[in-house]
UniProtKB/Swiss-Prot annotation:
It holds the Pfam family B56. PANTHER family: SERINE/THREONINE PROTEIN PHOSPHATASE 2A PP2A REGULATORY SUBUNIT B, SERINE_THREONINE-PROTEIN PHOSPHATASE 2A 56 KDA REGULATORY SUBUNIT GAMMA ISOFORM. This is Serine/threonine-protein phosphatase 2A 56 kDa regulatory subunit gamma isoform. GO terms for cellular component: chromosome, centromeric region; cytosol; Golgi apparatus; nucleoplasm; nucleus; protein phosphatase type 2A complex. Residues 476-509 are annotated as: Disordered. InterPro entries: ARM-like, ARM-type_fold, PP2A_B56. Transmembrane segments: none annotated. A motif (Nuclear localization signal) lies at residues 416-422. The B regulatory subunit might modulate substrate selectivity and catalytic activity, and might also direct the localization of the catalytic enzyme to a particular subcellular compartment. The PP2A-PPP2R5C holoenzyme may specifically dephosphorylate and activate TP53 and play a role in DNA damage-induced inhibition of cell proliferation. PP2A-PPP2R5C may also regulate the ERK signaling pathway through ERK dephosphorylation. It comes from Homo sapiens. Induction: Up-regulated upon DNA damage. It comes from the Eukaryota.
Length: 524
């Protein structure tokens, strides 16, 4: 690369096809020359478009020549789109070289080097300053790849592994417009160059590995996953071992990264595509999701619940039996979550007909797991909407198998009584310990230094248990009431929070006088 400052110009010129820095010239339109000269003029225009301009430090420099290049690119896009037999063998190296000169560059430093989660609604992406030219170069190259005249056997000499590697590096661009073009370009190359397919998959794997285990920052993960979704869809059956390893060792660990929300829809699609291809992968996939389940990130939990429902929508009944117990133990925890969106999303599973049919076939295993969590939270959860959803789930369980529901009720009641007896025994043990302590001559000395209190029996696990018949009636009534949705007719009103008042603070505020009030009192 050489920088040309001649005549005040700030162009950066590619020297590979020229004898040094030069000013661009306005060439004739390709349509205005005889057919015999069109190929030569086409090559001249491609070389002319290898001149790079400064759009960053001085956007107003070389405006005339920037427009000349833009017009040349637009003309070439039109030319190869509407004409046949114009992509001759000498054109291939010129097109690939022009694309490489314009596109393969060092990306600017990230505007978000800490790797915090990008929020599309709040954060503005950093846009590429030279986009007026880059967009047309991408459009031209795509039309070149998609042309009926394009011959991969000729192009493979120029579009090779080095070219693909440089193309993949551009996926870290912060400009979403560029990543969108890159996604389409790479997909076309993958489709046309069979010899590059394994290499492309391998290099995408490497990008994912670096992202998961080293940087946790890359702008193009969603776009790469979107390409992979299409690739996975085309995998032949039975799946190769390398594809299964890719799912288990590359795709599933992507769930660990904190910026999951940026690419989760594309990731979930890839996972579900694999399960539709091979249902035997269901157990390792679900167990991996349960292993990576978020502990303190509620929005991420909602994403996991969304993905699990997508998996359950395509699961085979024989595979469901293998994962139902650990899965519903996790769902029971989600129903108990104080974050209402997590509890709500988990309870929406009971609105899915296919999932309900799977639950119905295996109710004897699932209901005993879910019942304690559903019952406890039917009264103690702070969000009233959750109460209605829980009663709906209990009602469905009750209609599914009345005897099993009653058995679970009695079993839960017995366990509650056991817990109360155990608590009572603990209280009595503490009373004995305290009485023994009182018998010690030095008790009065130590009792003044520390205050001891007898443990109070606390109901920490839900309300006192109703009678079975009463529970049935309560569940039916509450589920019916929840379906009515009384909030529907109420006008929307924002509820104001009421902060608990400390009496000492309140008294101090009432007694407080501002400085000007004190001054006026002194003046009197």
């Amino acid at each position: 690369m050489l920088t040309c400052n001649k005549a005040g110009s700030r162009m950066v010129v590619d020297a590979a096809n020229s004898n040094g820095p030069f000013q661009p010239v306005v060439l004739l339109h390709i349509r205005d020359v005889p057919p015999a000269d069109q190929e030569k003029l086409f090559i001249q225009k491609l070389r002319q478009c290898c001149v790079l301009f400064d759009f960053v430090s001085d956007p107003l420099s070389d405006l005339k020549w920037k427009e000349v290049k833009r017009a040349a690119l637009s003309e070439m896009v039109e030319y190869i789109t509407h004409n046949r037999n114009v992509i001759t063998e000498p054109i291939y190296p010129e097109v690939v070289h022009m694309f490489a000169v314009n596109m393969f560059r060092t990306l600017p430093p990230s505007s978000n080097p800490t790797g915090a989660e990008f929020d599309p609604e709040e954060d503005e992406p950093t846009l590429e300053a030279a986009w007026p030219h880059l967009q047309l170069v991408y459009e031209f190259f795509l039309r070149f790849l998609e042309s009926p005249d394009f011959q991969p056997n000729i192009a493979k000499k120029y579009i090779d592994q080095k070219f693909v590697l440089q193309l993949l590096e551009l996926f870290d661009s912060e400009d979403p417009r560029e990543r969108d073009f890159l996604k389409t370009t790479l997909h076309r190359i993958y489709g046309k160059f069979l010899g590059l397919r394994a290499y492309i998959r391998k290099q995408i794997n490497n990008i994912f590995y670096r992202f998961i285990y080293e940087t946790e920052h890359h702008n193009g993960i969603a776009e790469l996953l979107e390409i992979l979704g299409s690739i996975i869809n085309g995998f032949a059956l039975p799946l190769k071992e390398e594809h299964k390893i890719f799912l288990l060792k590359v795709l599933l660990p992507l769930h660990k990264v904190k910026s999951l929300s940026v690419y989760h829809p594309q990731l979930a699609y890839c996972v579900v595509q694999f399960l539709e291809k091979d249902s035997t992968l269901t157990e390792p996939v679900v167990m991996a999701l349960l292993k990576y389940w978020p502990k303190t990130h509620s929005p991420k939990e909602v994403m996991f619940l969304n993905e699990l429902e997508e998996i359950l929508d395509v699961i085979e009944p024989s595979e469901f039996v293998k994962i139902m117990e650990p899965l519903f133990r996790q769902l029971a925890k989600c129903v108990s979550s104080p974050h209402f969106q997590v509890a709500e999303r988990a309870l929406y599973y009971w609105n899915n007909e296919y999932i309900m049919s799977l639950i119905s076939d295996n109710a004897a295993k699932i209901l005993p797991i879910m019942f304690p969590s559903l019952y406890r939270n039917s009264k103690t959860h702070w969000n009233k909407t959750i109460h209605g959803l829980i009663y709906n789930a209990l009602k469905l369980f009750m209609e599914m198998n009345q005897k099993l529901f009653d058995d679970c009720t009695q079993q839960f009641k017995a366990e509650k009584l056991k817990e109360k007896l155990k608590m009572k025994e603990r209280e009595e043990a503490w009373v004995k310990i305290e009485n023994l302590a009182k018998a010690n001559p030095q008790y009065t000395v130590y009792s003044q230094a520390s205050t001891m209190s007898i443990p109070v029996a606390m109901e920490t696990d839900g309300p006192l248990f109703e009678d079975v018949q009463m529970l049935r009636k309560t569940v039916k009534d509450e589920a019916h009431q929840a379906q009515k949705d009384p909030k529907k007719d109420r006008p929307l009103a924002r509820r104001k929070s009421e902060l608990p008042q400390d009496p000492h603070t309140k008294k101090a505020l009432e007694a407080h006088c501002r400085a000007d009030e004190l001054a006026s009192q002194d003046g009197r």
